[in-house]
């Protein structure tokens, strides 16, 4: 890789003891044993995102290297662990949402034909169905003989895969894109089974045009795809902006009233929306309570965590639970 001559030189690598002394010299309280364990297991760079709010800010809003009084490495570890456990909870919820979307697409697209998902009548004129099918074929090829069902349909049916078989090798991004490509009528039918009903009659002509162009659920599935992939790659959820999802047309739905006005781009908005979907998919689920309690007890009790870093707005109250 060619180096840009104008670029600054990279900082030299440092040892764990050097990193500990650097943190201490900048004003952080550090227990050597705890810090050594975490800096070796997780690395300085990965942890640095979690101590960022503890850095001092000067009068011109410039972030300095030094830490604010009271900065403690133990709090950084607690925040990192809270984020890791939140990823586990999100992954668990997304599994059920992903399977639920697959099943609804199967019911719609394969009602009369196992290969109905290949018929253009279900899709918008601008949707690249051929491109989507090529991408799906690559998923099938990668699964190959290691997937019993794929291997069976390849040998017995000449490589023709009903959607209920194909969907098992697709990821959430694949099925989300397929949903985005559906006609508005098809999108609305599926959305209603998730408890997302848009009253077009209550909208202005321009608003109806916007909703028909892209159903709000498609916007949310796009965001949830990124959230899911962030979890799959062990990325940070706290204090991070995701692709925004419009809230304008869903805030009238019971359970979604407290979403931010206009759009939502932080993890708590995604949590609220997931909770709504999961209450439909699995009535009586304990997932919303578990996530609410985790956020209240493990995030909001830490000194450097502000509610807005999670996307919790002034009209949302999170109470600690057991």
What are the roles of these predicted feature ranges?
Residues 1-322:
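Long, contiguous internal "core" modules enriched in hydrophobic/ aromatic residues
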């Amino acid at each position: 890789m060619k180096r840009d001559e104008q670029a600054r030189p990279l900082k030299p690598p440092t040892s764990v003891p050097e990193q500990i002394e650097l943190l201490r010299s900048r004003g952080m309280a550090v227990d050597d044993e705890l810090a050594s364990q975490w800096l070796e297991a997780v690395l300085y760079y990965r942890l640095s995102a979690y101590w960022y709010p503890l850095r001092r800010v000067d009068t011109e809003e410039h972030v300095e290297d030094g830490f604010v009084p009271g900065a403690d490495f133990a709090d950084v570890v607690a925040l990192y662990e809270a984020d890791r456990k939140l990823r586990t909870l999100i992954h668990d919820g997304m599994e059920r949402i992903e399977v639920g979307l697959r099943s609804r697409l199967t019911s719609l697209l394969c009602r009369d034909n196992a290969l109905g998902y290949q018929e253009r009548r279900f899709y918008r004129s601008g949707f690249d169905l051929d491109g989507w099918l090529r991408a799906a074929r690559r998923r099938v090829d990668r699964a190959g003989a290691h997937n019993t069902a794929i291997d069976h349909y390849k040998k017995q049916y000449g490589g023709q895969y009903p959607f209920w078989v194909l969907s098992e090798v697709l990821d959430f991004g694949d099925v989300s894109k397929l949903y985005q490509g559906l006609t508005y009528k098809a999108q609305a039918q599926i959305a209603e089974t998730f408890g997302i009903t848009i009253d077009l009659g209550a909208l202005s002509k321009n608003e109806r045009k916007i909703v028909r162009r892209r159903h709000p659920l498609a916007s949310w599935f796009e965001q949830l795809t990124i959230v899911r992939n962030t979890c799959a790659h062990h990325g940070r959820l706290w204090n991070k902006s995701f692709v925004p999802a419009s809230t304008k047309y869903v805030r009238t739905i019971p359970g979604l009233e407290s979403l931010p006005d206009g759009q939502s781009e932080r993890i708590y908005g995604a949590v609220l929306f997931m909770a709504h979907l999961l209450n439909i998919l699995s009535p009586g689920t304990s997932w919303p309570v578990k996530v609410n309690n985790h956020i209240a007890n493990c995030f909001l009790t830490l000194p450097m965590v502000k509610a807005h870093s999670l996307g919790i707005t002034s009209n949302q109250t999170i109470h600690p639970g057991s």
